[in-house]
Amino acid sequence: MDPEAFSASLFKWDPRGAMPPPTRLLEAAVAPPPPPPALPPPQPLSAAYSIKTRELGGLEELFQAYGIRYYTAAKIAELGFTVNTLLDMKDEELDDMMNSLSQIFRWELLVGERYGIKAAIRAERRRLEEEELRRRGHLLSDGGTNALDALSQEGLSEEPVQQQEREAVGSGGGGTTWEVVAAAGGGRMKQRRRKKVVAAGREKRGGASAEEDEETEEGQEDDWNINDASGGISERQREHPFIVTEPGEVARGKKNGLDYLFHLYEQCRDFLIQVQNIAKERGEKCPTKVTNQVFRYAKKAGASYINKPKMRHYVHCYALHCLDEEASNALRRAFKERGENVGAWRQACYKPLVAIAARQGWDIDTIFNAHPRLAIWYVPTKLRQLCHSERSNAAAAAASSSVSGGGGGGDHLPHF
């Protein structure tokens, strides 16, 4: 056998067996390149914004509409200030904060930013106050007992709504509740209109003193309270936070006694003296009567239980206690024995005061001003009107008796 032929057959290589089919070569030529590795999905803008907002403590939402730069808000947050902290700060404290920001971070605030920060804080305060007012409005419009209880704890609340609800429940009427709510809303609208009238009157008077404004406002409020009930002379009823107690008796339960009520008037006198001392130190005009300034000072001092509606509501009861303590104590014992509520006792306090005014020429203002503890209080308009009415009745009775020649008329004190 030829060795060359053997080696040639052994090492013979057929290139056609090693080459791929033409179709596969074409597929390999046109095949797309492998895709790049997948990137992580982009973070949503809302999520990123919420993270930034959390880092700034809500300052970006507070400042974004007032031209404050993002870096400025970020540095304020870095100093540890939050929205709630800024809302509770005074203007002087805000100025100190902005000065500290400039000194610590060497960051010069623009003039518009300084004003914008204060404007944003004022706008946020107004928004929160409006939300609080709307919340209270919804609370009242619900007509629930809890809302009335909350108002009675604060001071005084209107009782006709509660009385109408009781009548509606007693009569079994299902649709009258909405009418009660509408009536309550109408009363609030009337009160707002009255406040606008009082404010307009102050602007017209111009140079009138603060105490004259207080006295005028007090008289107008009393007039409206008297004439609210269908134009009659019956006074608006209220939910009273007190109960009738005898002298020296300590009240039990949630409500306080009458000794506590009279003690509140003594506290008001102390607060007035403090306000007068502060005014003298500052060289300002000193108030001579218990005005809104005194009530605001009492609230700042922590005596939030002393408020203007409550103290003005019972001032004639305190006047009877000061002018004739024996008659006041006898009236308290009589109403306590009969189980009467404090509203009936309050109405009964008018008659002895009118009798005292009758013995002193019907001049109830002079009687108040002559007493050291009553001189700081305004005379209730209803008490003044009752004295005027009884004086007219007495004069008419005297004139008729002199004309007819008959006997003199008796005591014509009206029933309160």
Curated annotation (Swiss-Prot):
One of its GO terms (molecular function) is DNA binding. Pfam families: C_LFY_FLO, SAM_LFY. It is found in: Nucleus. Keywords: Activator, Developmental protein, DNA-binding, Nucleus, Transcription, Transcription regulation. Expressed in floral meristems and in indeterminate vegetative meristems. The keyword Lyase does not apply. Residues 238-242, 307-314, 378-381 bind DNA. InterPro entries: FLO/LFY_C, FLO_LFY, Floricaula/leafy_C_sf, LFY_SAM. GO terms for biological process: regulation of DNA-templated transcription. Residues 210-225 have a biased composition (Acidic residues). Residues 154-237 are annotated as: Disordered. One of its GO terms (cellular component) is nucleus. The record marks 285, 292, 296, 343 as: Interaction with DNA. The keyword Transmembrane helix does not apply. Probable transcription factor that act to specify determinacy in the progenitor cells for both flowers and leaves. Belongs to the FLO/LFY family. This is Floricaula/leafy homolog 2. It comes from Nicotiana tabacum (Common tobacco). The lineage of its organism: Eukaryota, Viridiplantae, Streptophyta, Embryophyta, Tracheophyta.
